[in-house]
């Protein structure tokens, strides 16, 4: 902007090239207010913005995910009779495809064709990615067929996008066919291709196939990265095979690929699931010593591990460690502890936790209250269950079917027929069906 001001002060009228250079710099540095100011100055000085001027603004606002601003400049471009080019459409199509707004994406694709412009491989891939995100694999594959039909051959990014979509829909046989097609067309799979397929098979619990792909990948001289290892380690842990997960951990280190917070979180959670809290603590200490900051999910896993191993008190004491690390407990933290105390029949502790939640402005949910209500109801402590039920209503939290059935069964067992019928009627009014036995 200073360059433009200096030229104007010397009586030199900046041209379109100067203005475009200034716009480019401002957009690259995210100075959007200044960019708008320069755009206005161009008009005031009688310099008509061209397609490049508009593209810089449209592209810039697309990058910072401001669709309204991007569309505003596109409409201004059309109003002034400036013909959009493939860059203009690429920006807008990419923006809406990334957001899964496929009606808008298709509209800009049609408009592009009306100007006699044909999509290139990048645009086709963005559209395919949009349909995959929206869960419309039929449309994604249709666009792929159209792309090939127009002589625009998919590259590795296009194939990886389709593979990811198919794996998300658990269509692994179709994904395998696509991998074969990819090879037949002379497009070599890359690290992303294999990691996507490995993730798909791990989600299905087919660890054997995931490991086969891992071996194929190594045979093809593709070096795995931390994402590949995290995917496999997570797959092993989900199958309960911590031994194999530890082997992968060792293999990873032997290749000088080092764990990140995701790796540690997976292993901490898995050891806690098995009640191996000491092992989980070993990973937590190592993680902290390496300067990797645990997040709320990591801490919640440790608390869950204590609760599962019947040591809720230690889990609650661990809250202080969280706070010392500037990590505040959330709803999952408190629900885990409440569930643990209900299992141990220490119901008075659940009240303490409710008070702590209130003090820390953590809003309990239906699950929180259901656990406490059920804990009191199964032991016939209906006075306390009623108090919690009323507290739930006072906080604006709606009971669900489980809430009503816990309360009704508790009152029936206590011989309180009046209360149980009142709750039964209220339950029906809310649209919940009672148990057949009631």
Predicted regions, residues:
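N-terminal targeting peptides
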Residues: 1-20, 29-37, 41-44, 48, ...
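Pentatricopeptide repeat
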Residues: 15-20, 24, 35, 50-55, ...
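Methionine-biased hydrophobic packing positions in alpha-helices, especially
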Residues: 7, 42, 58, 77, ...
